[in-house]
């Protein structure tokens, strides 16, 4: 793998590599990447999906490489601006605190002032308790406020200091979302060289590349949320607290206009909710016709934006001017996205409304390209550059990475597959349960699930991930099993109840009798080596919900082009997801354990063999 990466860099070519768990793929791409960066004065950008892998690269792999190579090189973990405190904005917020904040928020501001004097890097991760989001929004770095001109000479401006290190770095570690957010060159706007992606002289390596398609679709699309628009406007003026920037400026007319616009926002999104036929099972509704609801927001948003522009012109205070300009841009961007959504601007996009929240429901207008391949082909796989994609799970079984390469626009890019060195015949056993109802018989299936989960938990004495495809099913099974598992002295951890994903994994590792119930985010990117995880239970084959608007649009496009939506999309996507879930179990050469599939379709359906053939070769027992 290292040789293939070195050759791709040498020849300014692209590469897709599937490297099985245990290959040591991070070092295999880091060694040639670092050497190439140093010898050719280039910048290596390594993008991952998870924080875990970023931390592994920065704290373990790259320091090890520094010792082995006996070469000095600069590494920066690149975080988004919103993670950094801006001292200039903090001082402005303190000076205007009476007009901006309520009493509890002012107490929070004081806590941040004390922390700002002692923090080493000024980022959210350095705070022991996450700050109030409203307060943090007033003091974090913002692109048009915290600039090189306003903050560049301040040694305590954490973002500007980080930016200097970023530009000087040999290796930049970041995440996929931030990468695509900055793909227009805004990472280093002073560097206009067209020879790279973010910095002019860079090349990029995407690890955990199986997530690139989904993340790119989000970043290339649009989203206007009721919550986000409300938060932005309330920074201008919040009628409930009677605080905000217009209150500081004593602009009575602007205060009234903002309060009225906030009412229009709530009314508009209420109409969106009424127009959409949501249910407990259906939280996303596809929009197929323009003017889904009447556009009653553009006019008040435009009027509010005009007020902000006028106040900017009248303002002498550069800091306040920057704050107004930033909020004015947010209003403008929301207005443009709203207009694009209501017009259904692009035939290549799918549009939908999403409902979130269980008690206080809010709505988001979404749009995303049905197919990201044409976009990524031109953005990433251009001539004279090097983009390397790698992951442990890119293939769907004997097809030379063709499916993945087609999905991301890398059809012409060479592919390389390297198998895992692990001895799965010895380390892993697969159980497939035939004596269980079809998952589509939900009532009988859920009752049987609890019985079979308990059976296999006894076999491994807990120490298990139980992976679900439905949050609702997970909650129902957890409620049914909680007391019984407690009696058996297993500690049940359930995603979404109280702890974050990171906290759940950390807690899981502490006790050998833990059982963790998880959905989407636990199928991949979670690493628990050793005895703590000895059992992975797959409750259902992970087919994507076919009526999710984006999935539905992709299936319809395949059908319209004469293809078979099931074999061309639904099945390969589910196979990849299953491979990722099963891949949680064996992380080192000494790991041992069992994988359980509680879905009889893997035996009863013709496509079942495709799932089994895509898994590592190991002993299989049907029960």
Question: Where in the sequence are the language-model features?
Answer:
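Conserved RecA-like ASCE P-loop NTPase motor core of nucleic-acid helicases/translocases
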Residues: 43-52, 389-390, 462-469, 473, ...
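A contiguous, basic/glycine-rich beta-loop/short-helix subdomain that forms a polymer-engagement track
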Residues: 136-172, 180-194, 310-436, 445-451, ...
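Signature of the SF2 helicase/ATPase Hel1-core->accessory helical subdomain module
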Residues: 29, 35, 55, 60-63, ...
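Conserved helicase motor "Helicase C" RecA-like lobe of SF1/SF2 P-loop NTPases
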Residues: 469-496
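Conserved pre-motif I regulatory segment
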Residues: 1-18, 28
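N-terminal targeting/trafficking signals and adjacent low-complexity tails
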Residues: 596-623
């Amino acid at each position: 793998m290292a040789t293939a990466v070195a050759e791709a860099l040498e020849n300014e070519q692209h590469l897709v590599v599937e490297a099985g768990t245990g290959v040591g793929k991070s070092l295999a791409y880091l060694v040639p990447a670092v050497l190439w960066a140093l010898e050719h004065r280039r910048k290596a950008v390594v993008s991952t999906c998870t924080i875990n892998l970023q931390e592994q690269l920065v704290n373990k792999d790259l320091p090890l490489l520094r010792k082995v190579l006996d070469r000095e090189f600069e590494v920066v973990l690149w975080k988004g601006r919103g993670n950094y405190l801006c001292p200039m904005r903090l001082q402005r917020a303190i000076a205007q605190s009476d007009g901006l904040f309520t009493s509890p928020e002012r107490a929070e501001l004081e806590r941040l002032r004390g922390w700002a004097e002692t923090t080493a890097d000024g980022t959210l991760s350095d705070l022991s308790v996450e700050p109030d989001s409203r307060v943090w929004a007033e003091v974090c770095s913002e692109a048009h406020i915290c600039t090189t001109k306003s903050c560049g000479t301040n040694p305590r401006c954490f973002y500007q200091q980080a930016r200097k290190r970023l530009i000087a770095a040999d290796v930049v570690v970041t995440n996929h979302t931030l990468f695509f957010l900055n793909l227009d060159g805004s990472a280093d706007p002073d560097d206009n060289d067209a020879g790279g992606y973010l910095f002019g002289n860079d090349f990029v390596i995407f690890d955990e590349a199986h997530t690139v398609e989904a993340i790119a679709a989000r970043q290339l699309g649009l989203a206007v949320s009721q919550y986000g628009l409300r938060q932005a406007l309330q920074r201008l003026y919040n009628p409930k607290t009677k605080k905000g920037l217009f209150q500081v400026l004593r602009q009575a007319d602007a205060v009234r206009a903002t309060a009225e616009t906030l009412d229009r926002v709530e009314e508009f999104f209420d109409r969106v909710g009424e127009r959409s036929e949501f249910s407990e099972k259906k939280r996303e509704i596809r929009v197929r016709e323009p003017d889904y609801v009447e556009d009653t927001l553009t006019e008040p948003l435009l009027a509010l934006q005009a007020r902000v522009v006028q106040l900017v012109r009248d303002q002498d205070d550069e800091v306040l001017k920057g704050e107004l300009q930033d909020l004015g841009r947010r209003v403008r961007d929301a207005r443009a996205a709203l207009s694009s959504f209501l017009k259904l601007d692009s035939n290549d996009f799918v549009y939908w409304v999403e409902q979130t929240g269980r008690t206080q429901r809010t709505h988001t207008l979404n749009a995303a390209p049905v197919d990201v391949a044409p976009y990524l082909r031109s953005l990433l796989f251009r001539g004279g550059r090097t983009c390397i994609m790698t992951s442990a799970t890119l293939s769907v079984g004997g097809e030379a990475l063709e499916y993945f390469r087609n999905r991301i626009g890398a059809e012409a890019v060479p592919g390389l597959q390297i198998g895992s060195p692990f001895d799965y015949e010895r380390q892993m056993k697969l159980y497939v349960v035939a004596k269980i109802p079809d998952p589509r018989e939900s009532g009988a299936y859920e009752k049987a699930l609890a019985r079979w989960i308990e059976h296999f938990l006894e076999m491994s004495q807990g120490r298990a991930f139980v992976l679900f495809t439905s949050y609702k099913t997970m909650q129902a099974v957890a409620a049914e099993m909680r007391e019984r598992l407690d009696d058996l002295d297993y500690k049940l951890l359930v995603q979404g109840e109280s702890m974050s994903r990171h906290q759940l994994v950390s807690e899981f590792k502490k006790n050998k009798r833990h059982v963790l119930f998880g959905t989407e985010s636990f199928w991949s990117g979670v690493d628990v080596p050793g005895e703590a995880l000895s059992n992975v239970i797959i409750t259902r084959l992970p087919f994507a919900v076919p009526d999710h608007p984006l999935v539905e649009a992709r299936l319809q496009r395949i059908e319209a082009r004469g293809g078979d939506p099931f074999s061309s999309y639904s099945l390969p996507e589910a196979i990849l997801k299953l491979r990722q879930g099963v891949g949680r179990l064996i992380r080192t050469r000494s790991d041992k354990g069992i994988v359980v599939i509680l879905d009889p379709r893997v035996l009863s359906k013709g496509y079942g063999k495709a799932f089994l053939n895509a898994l590592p070769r190991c002993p299989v027992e049907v029960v």
